[in-house]
Curated annotation (Swiss-Prot):
Domain of life of the source: Archaea
NCBIfam families noted in UniProt: purM (TIGR00878)
Disulphides: none
UniProt protein name: Phosphoribosylformylglycinamidine cyclo-ligase
Enzyme class label: ligase
Organism classification: Archaea, Methanobacteriati, Methanobacteriota, Methanomada group, Methanococci
Record-level Gene Ontology MF annotations: ATP binding; phosphoribosylamine-glycine ligase activity; phosphoribosylformylglycinamidine cyclo-ligase activity
UniProt KW keywords: ATP-binding, Cytoplasm, Ligase, Nucleotide-binding, Purine biosynthesis
Record GO biological process: 'de novo' IMP biosynthetic process; adenine biosynthetic process
Gene3D superfamilies linked: PurM-like C-terminal domain (3.90.650.10), PurM-like, N-terminal domain (3.30.1330.10)
Amino acid sequence: MVTYKDAGVDIYKEDKVIRALASQIKFERNDAIKPADLKGHYAGAIEFGDYYLVLCTDGVGSKMVVAEMANKFDTVPIDMIAMNVNDAICIGAEPVALVDYMAVEDITEDIASQIGKGLNDGIKESNINLIGGETASLPNMIKGVDLAGTVLAVVKKDEIVSGKEVKPGDLIVGLRSSGIHSNGLSLARKVFFDIANLDVNSKLSHGKTVAEELLTPTKIYVKPVLEMIKQVNVKGLAHITGGGFRKLKRLNKEVCYKIDELPEILPIFKEIQNLGSVADEEMFKTFNMGIGFCVIVDKEDAEKIIEISNHHNIPAFVIGKIEDSVELNGETKRETVLVEYNNKKMIME
């Protein structure tokens, strides 16, 4: 059975590397501009009067490799923007501006135009301004193109959504993803291109080509989630990216997140699992599995969240609930994420 680690990505090693880096960051300004207490959350924030200024930075990862293989670059900028704005809204902040960074080996005007179109589509869907950026020609350092960006968002101090209010009895509403989004591409490429010997134009069993599936842009959840925050007492928000539902532990770490009512898994994930003989646990630790964003609310507010999401043409479902503890093989587990799928219970550590 192939794993994400076999494809060159070790998420546990990445966690250790991040901790090693963060352990050396000790300086902090000694004035009124102080960081918010959001350690380990989706975004960082600093005080600015009655507001927090929120910053997120991210890129598109190896999805760009598929774009180069297909010679199609107009969707990956949407992914880059989505990865940033979807993180920013996890603390209730409204994204307002973006700066981008593009590193290139060499680039044509056609590719630049495609990237520009994608940037425009992404900022329009997110309702943000692109206010600057940098393009670096680095022929001796990289091959192809890499694209990243940083988003600025704002939130009133008394409106921040930290996840600390999440408690047993709350429901988890899952918002449908558009597909693979921007995580797990290394494993997907290994399965499709190395194991199954397909190419970007190969048709999968459900009719779409490999390129169509892998280059479908990440869903941008800004508009529905900001509307939810205005209308409902939202307790926790989670962008389901690398690591899958493990991301829920970025919220209240003292409870259990039980995912036991998942909707039908999207075809792209079935294709990857079947062609690569990937274990259920590995799939759920690598991919979003059809749920790109989670909203945690009181039981009585779940239907309103689903209604708002559906209004924005994003299917939504109650996929689980918050519990004090969960049972697995006769053992009581606390402070964890439990996923039930295919009559199997899996702890997402």
